[in-house]
A protein has these predicted regions:
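Conserved S-adenosyl-L-methionine
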Residues: 111-122
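Class I SAM-dependent methyltransferase SAM/SAH-binding core
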Residues: 1-33
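A short acidic, Gly/Pro-enriched loop at the edge of an enzyme's catalytic core
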Residues: 32-44
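A short SAM/SAH-binding and catalytic strip from SAM-dependent methyltransferases
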Residues: 42-57
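A short glycine-rich, Lys/Arg-flanked "PGG" loop and its adjoining helix->strand segment in the class I
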Residues: 59-71
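Acceptor-substrate binding/catalytic loop of class I
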Residues: 53, 85-101
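Core SAM-dependent methyltransferase catalytic element
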Residues: 121-137
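Conserved beta-strand signature within the Rossmann-like core of class I S-adenosyl-L-methionine
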Residues: 72-79
Length: 137
C-alpha cells in the first residue's frame, strides 16, 4: 500500500518483539515522553492507548501528536467508553472519556472531527464499549 509504519511502545520487551516480527522501526517511548519528529506522519493509529495517559497530560500529548502529523494528516483513536471517570485496573491507569469530553479535547488541540462511532458492530449502540474517532489536522 505504500505505507511505512513506525511503532511507538512503552515496553522495551514489546519493542524488540515488534521490531523482529514486523521489520519496522519501533520507538521505545510512551505518551508522557513523546519525542516524535514534527510534520512527519500522514496518519497516527492509536488504538486502546490514549486513555492510559493521565488526564492532566492529555492536552499536551494530543498537541504533540498533532504537531507530528503532516498537513491534513489523520488520527484514528479508540478508547473505552466512559463517564469521565479515572482509576486503576490492577496496576494499569485509565481515564474513561465520554464523547463530549473527548471531542472537546481533540478540538482544543487542533483536530477537526471526521467521524466518531461506537464499536463493535452487532450489538446495540448503547452497549458498545469502545468509542472510536477519526480526526484531521
Amino acid at each position: 500500500l505504500g505505507h511505512i509504519p513506525v511503532g511507538v511502545e512503552g515496553s522495551e520487551t514489546f519493542v524488540e518483539i515488534a521490531r523482529k516480527s514486523t521489520g519496522c522501526d519501533v520507538y521505545h517511548m510512551d505518551f508522557i515522553n513523546l519525542d516524535l519528529p514534527q510534520m512527519e506522519y500522514d496518519g497516527i493509529f492509536a488504538n486502546a492507548a490514549l486513555f492510559h495517559t493521565p488526564r492532566q497530560e492529555i492536552n499536551r500529548v494530543m498537541r504533540e501528536l498533532n504537531d507530528s502529523l503532516k498537513k491534513r494528516g489523520v488520527l484514528f483513536c479508540s478508547n473505552p467508553r466512559g463517564d469521565n471517570q479515572e482509576g486503576f485496573s490492577g496496576e494499569r491507569y485509565g481515564f474513561y472519556y465520554d464523547w463530549n469530553t473527548w471531542k472537546e479535547i481533540c478540538l482544543n488541540t487542533g483536530f477537526e472531527e471526521i467521524k466518531h462511532f461506537y464499536r463493535p458492530d452487532g450489538i446495540p449502540e448503547e452497549e458498545r464499549p469502545w468509542l472510536a474517532s477519526v480526526w484531521r489536522k
